[in-house]
UniProtKB/Swiss-Prot annotation:
Pfam family, any one: Exportin-T
Source organism of this protein record: Debaryomyces hansenii (strain ATCC 36239 / CBS 767 / BCRC 21394 / JCM 1990 / NBRC 0083 / IGC 2968)
GO terms of biological process kind: tRNA processing; tRNA re-export from nucleus
Localization annotation: Nucleus; Cytoplasm
Record GO terms (molecular function): small GTPase binding; tRNA binding
Coiled coil: none
Annotated function: tRNA nucleus export receptor which facilitates tRNA translocation across the nuclear pore complex. Involved in pre-tRNA splicing, probably by affecting the interaction of pre-tRNA with splicing endonuclease.
Protein origin, superkingdom: Eukaryota
GO cellular component, one term: cytoplasm
Record family assignment: Belongs to the exportin family.
PANTHER family: EXPORTIN-T (PTHR15952:SF11), EXPORTIN-T/LOS1 (PTHR15952)
Annotated protein name in UniProt: Exportin-T
InterPro entries: ARM-like, ARM-type_fold, Exportin-1/Importin-b-like, Exportin-T_C, XPOT
Length: 1000
């Protein structure tokens, strides 16, 4: 067996073994791990290696230890006793033979001993720790090394606070700790102190020394602290702060020491006794960044512990605690000012807690202290001199730090508004405007800091951090000061002269974010023109940096949309639009593939659309003669029309995809321009403007006719028409029929495309519900549209492959929802008669049947609920009226003949659905929120029918419930509630009714 196990491990670890053989080896290995026979065999192999003095190879030994470790929890007390004896025998062998295994083997063995300790110390081997101490009595380095690892492993098992444990295990661990305190604590601590005091005993081995420092930090958490904090012991630990190889671990140990839970007075005495603030202030090892980071962590923990003491102590301790704070702040300031952010961030938690505590203890918030802190924070928020601000990753990291610093600054603003209002304007003024007469002296980092602080200062007013009465904010001195800063900045050339992306983007972001401060300016028109001029300069829309340029295109759109400037300077406007012409030239680029073979779209065009939308909005808002508006529209549209004409006439068959993409982009630009023009919904569009959009719709249709086989063209055409509707209104009638017929006739219409098309048609129904021409269009369209919908929903691919394709399943679910929402749009917009005209009445039973089919489909609860909603809509307009439409606002409803039998069909099927769905579908669980919503919708259906049909419905329902086997008492109660309570109350009743019946 020994040889089999050894061979199996060798094969499993081999990189060249036959795959079949390797799988067999793994199967055998797993069997060894999981059986008692395998465990015993591995333990025997380990013991034989001792007796024969023939060491195992390292990989095989690790496997043996792994098997032993994984089986400890399965052993009975007798087996645990034997294992305890065997492992101590093995440990003796390792020590006496001076076997220095690799670290991973030593740690694995230590982990086994730590695990074994938990099962043996209480009753099987109470001398476990004394036995360990006996092994290191002669100061053998290998023995002390393994001993330290076992002690750490015991900590991991019984008190590591980062490991989640069951209540049972935690109770056991508490008993283990109690027994250690009683039997072994003093011996252990004396031993640790001895080793740390005499590092020569372990030949100054750095790893072992660090292990013992860790042990102090681990065990002090639950041992008696007085054993550790005698002057002698503390001085021993402190001396390691001067040893390069131990000082980092020493910092972490001291953090654990001061973190021990204690009464406030005792904790304060401990901090005073350790005198850590003086020690920290005396350390200056800037060259060792890791050490400085750990010292900063230690400073931070001292501060946090003082905060905890203050918040949980009596007021008479305040002066002593405050003195400790004052002693600590020099080191906090030193670390906050450190050039490396990783070091500075270590003291952020303390700063945050201190500032929050200042809200409770005003005495802490001295002007002198907070002023110094604010100055340090501001300086830290500036880009470092060696950072050129162009690396995205480092900028992101810096912004994370800056965001935390801003939080501190905001808290200071709340604590001491007068300090904030005095300091920040000085920073803004000196950073932005100090060298306006000599731009060569302007450092972009200073300017960027000024822009950032101007932004934060403005936000502080918006959020009223300085606690002004709301009605006074707009007239307050800080508010006026912000306006002055913004106007001064806009009129200054400083951002034009400092060529840096951070300045350019920072400026435009600032202006857009705080546009409302400009809207109240008395010279608003002049300021707006200046901003538009800056946007259209090389600083913004024409910037050489693509990142700045594309972002500015979006910011330009946001600015125009937010401010809605009403411009009346004709020459400025005309020059502006002519200047922007080069940016409106569209050049399509086909998607490319990245290294992972994923499709990468060219993002420039989507950014370019922001310009078209901005210009559309600007033209719509012009306070000028209509002829100028028309000329501006021509200036935008004509190049697009020419481009589309070129696409249509281009017969290059090789580049059809690129040509279609070019046409798509031009159509999207036209539609997006129209969307911008429509932002002012109160606009009364003149005949000239309507004429221009009408021309555009004709161009769109011509393009669609020529590229009808391309989905992207159909999408773009639909997009454009959706944006034309508010402007053209009923003028669009002339074009819609053609648009719809071309799209529906497409042979390659996708499910997702039809889904979007139905949403578009729903918009048409809503906008033109009283338009006779649109009614006729929809009447002619409805039946073929329904055929298309049901055809796509039914088709599952040539070999039913769609049934297992999540994307197709999801698309079909979306199509069902859009189809039902379209029917809902017809009914709720008083056009229900469309469903039963002579043209469409043959489809109406199919529509109703689809609603019932979808309602019963519990695998799609959202679809089921929506289907029931549509049944409620149908019942509302047709239930109880002999198949006639009952909607006074449906002007064609009265003239149509009734549909025979629809009442009986609806009532019968609706009642069946209402009880079969919740009671016969096992997966219908009302504890599930989605099914609960379906149940509530069923209740609404029942209530709606009762309100429509009254006693006739109750009679039908009573007969159905009787046949279903419901008792007369329950049936009476159900019908009484159905009649007497409102819909909301009946929903609750129905849910309870179903829940209780299903529970019986």
């Amino acid at each position: 067996m020994d040889e089999q196990i050894s061979k199996a491990v060798e094969i499993a670890l081999s990189g060249t073994s036959d795959l079949v053989l390797k799988n067999q080896a793994f199967e055998f290995i797993n069997q060894i791990k999981s059986t008692e026979e395998g465990y015993k065999s591995c333990l025997d192999i380990l013991l034989k290696s001792i007796n024969s003095n023939s060491p195992l190879n390292q990989e095989f030994k690790f496997f043996i230890l792994q098997v032993i470790d994984e089986n400890i929890t399965k052993l009975n007390n007798e087996q645990l006793y034997e294992l305890n004896s065997d492992l101590f025998q093995y440990l003796n062998y390792v020590i006496n033979s001076n076997i220095n295994d690799p670290v991973y083997l030593k740690n694995k063995f230590a982990g086994i001993m730590g695990n074994l300790f938990c099962f043996t110390y209480l009753s099987i081997n109470p001398t476990f720790l004394k036995d360990l101490l006996a092994l290191i009595a002669d100061n053998n380095l290998i023995a002390i090394d393994i001993y330290s690892r076992i002690i750490i492993a015991v900590h991991t098992e019984i008190s590591d606070k980062f490991i989640s444990r069951s209540r049972e295990v935690q109770d056991r661990n508490n008993l283990l700790k109690d027994q250690i305190r009683t039997n072994d604590m003093n011996l252990l601590v004396d031993n640790w102190q001895k080793i740390l005091r005499n590092p020569e005993l372990i030949q100054h081995n750095n790893e072992v020394l660090n292990n013992f420092l860790k042990i102090i930090g681990y065990y002090i958490n639950w041992m008696e602290i007085t054993l550790f904090i005698s002057n002698d012991f503390i001085n021993i630990i402190f001396q390691y702060l001067n040893k390069p190889d131990q000082r980092n671990e020493t910092c972490l140990t001291l953090i654990e020491v001061i973190s021990k839970k204690m009464k406030p007075l005792n904790k304060l005495e401990l901090i005073s006794l350790l005198n850590l603030t003086s020690i920290i202030n005396s350390i200056n090892n800037d060259d060792d960044l890791e050490f400085m980071e750990n010292i900063a962590k230690l400073s931070n923990q001292v501060g946090l512990e003082l905060v905890i003491v203050l918040e949980s102590s009596e007021l008479e301790l305040f002066d002593s605690i405050n003195q400790q704070f004052l002693n600590l702040w020099p080191s906090i300031f030193k670390f906050l000012s450190h050039e490396y952010d990783d070091i500075s961030q270590q003291i952020f938690p303390f700063i945050q807690q201190y500032l929050l505590t200042c809200k409770k203890f005003n005495q802490l918030a001295s002007i002198e202290l907070l002023s110094s802190l604010l100055n340090k924070i501001i300086l830290k928020m500036k880009f470092d001199d060696d950072d050129d601000g162009t690396d995205d990753e480092s900028t992101e990291q810096f912004n994370e730090v800056r965001l935390k610093l801003k939080t501190f600054q905001d808290t200071i603003a709340i604590l001491k508004p007068e300090l904030f209002l005095e300091a920040i304007p000085i920073v803004i003024n000196e950073s932005i405007f100090a060298n306006v007469s000599d731009f060569d002296k302007v450092n972009w980092r200073n300017l960027e800091l000024g822009l950032f602080e101007l932004n934060t200062f403005t936000e502080s007013l918006r959020n009223n951090l300085i606690n002004l009465p709301k009605q006074e904010i707009g007239n307050s001195k800080p508010y006026v000061l912000v306006q002055e800063f913004l106007i001064k900045l806009i009129n200054s050339d400083v951002v034009l002269k400092v060529d840096h992306p951070k300045i350019q983007l920072g400026f435009f972001e600032l202006i857009v974010r705080h546009y409302n401060f400009l809207n109240t300016n008395i010279n608003n028109q002049e300021v707006i023109l200046r901003i538009l001029e800056l946007f259209s300069s090389p600083l913004g829309l024409f910037n050489n940096s693509e990142k700045v340029r594309l972002r500015t295109w979006y910011l330009f759109f946001r600015f125009v949309k937010l401010t809605k400037p009403t411009l009346n300077n004709s020459s400025f406007i005309e020059n502006l639009f002519i200047k922007l012409q080069p940016l409106l030239v569209i050049k399509a680029e086909l998607p490319t593939k990245d290294e992972d073979n994923d499709t990468v779209e060219n993002g420039n065009f989507n950014n370019q659309l922001n310009l078209f939308e901005s210009i559309g909005l600007l033209i719509s808002l012009l306070s000028v003669d209509i002829s100028l508006k028309v000329r501006m529209i021509d200036l935008i549209f004509q190049p697009l029309f020419n481009d589309l004409e070129n696409c249509i006439s281009n017969k290059d068959k090789v580049n059809q995809q690129l040509i279609a993409l070019q046409a798509h982009h031009s159509l999207m630009a036209i539609g997006t321009f129209a969307r911008g023009y429509d932002y002012d919904y109160n606009n009364k569009y003149s005949a000239e403007i309507v004429g221009k959009i009408n021309n555009a719709s004709q161009v769109v249709l011509i393009t669609l006719e020529n590229f009808a086989k391309f989905e992207i063209i159909r999408d773009a055409a639909r997009f454009s028409f959706a944006r034309f509707i508010p402007i053209l209104n009923e003028e669009i009638n002339n074009h819609l029929s053609k648009l719809v017929s071309i799209i529906l006739a497409a042979n390659n219409l996708k499910i997702s495309e039809l889904t979007n098309f139905l949403n578009f048609l729903g918009q048409i129904v809503h906008n033109f519900q009283s338009n006779d021409n649109i009614y006729k269009l929809l009447n002619d369209l409805l039946s073929p549209l329904l055929d298309k919908i049901f055809s796509l929903l039914k088709y599952n691919g040539e070999n039913n492959e769609y049934e297992s394709m999540p994307d197709i399943i999801r698309d079909k679910e979306s199509l069902k929802k859009s189809y039902m929402n379209f029917i809902s749009a017809i009914i709720t917009n008083h056009s229900s008669s469309l469903l039963i005209t002579e043209t469409n009445k043959q489809k109406f039973p199919i529509i109703l049947e689809s609603f019932f089919v979808y309602a019963y489909n519990t695998s799609e609860p959202t679809v089921s609920k929506l289907a029931i909603t549509q049944l409620i809509n149908v019942v509302s307009v047709m239930g109880g009226h002999g198949g006639k439409i009952n909607d006074p606002q449906d002007k064609y409803g009265e003239s149509l003949p009734p549909l025979e039998g629809v009442d009986e069909y609806l009532m019968n099927k609706a009642v069946q659905l209402s009880f079969e769905l919740p009671f016969q579908k096992s997966e219908f669980d009302l504890k599930d929120a989605q099914y609960r919503l379906v149940g509530q919708e069923i209740a609404s259906l029942l209530k709606t029918y009762q309100e429509k049909r009254g006693d006739e419905y109750l009679t039908f329902l009573s007969n159905y419930l009787t046949n279903m086997g419901l008792s007369s008492e329950l049936m009476t109660d159900f019908c009484t509630n159905l009649v007497k309570v409102d819909q909301r109350a009946f929903k609750k009743y129905f849910i309870t009714f179903v829940t209780e019946l299903k529970g019986k």
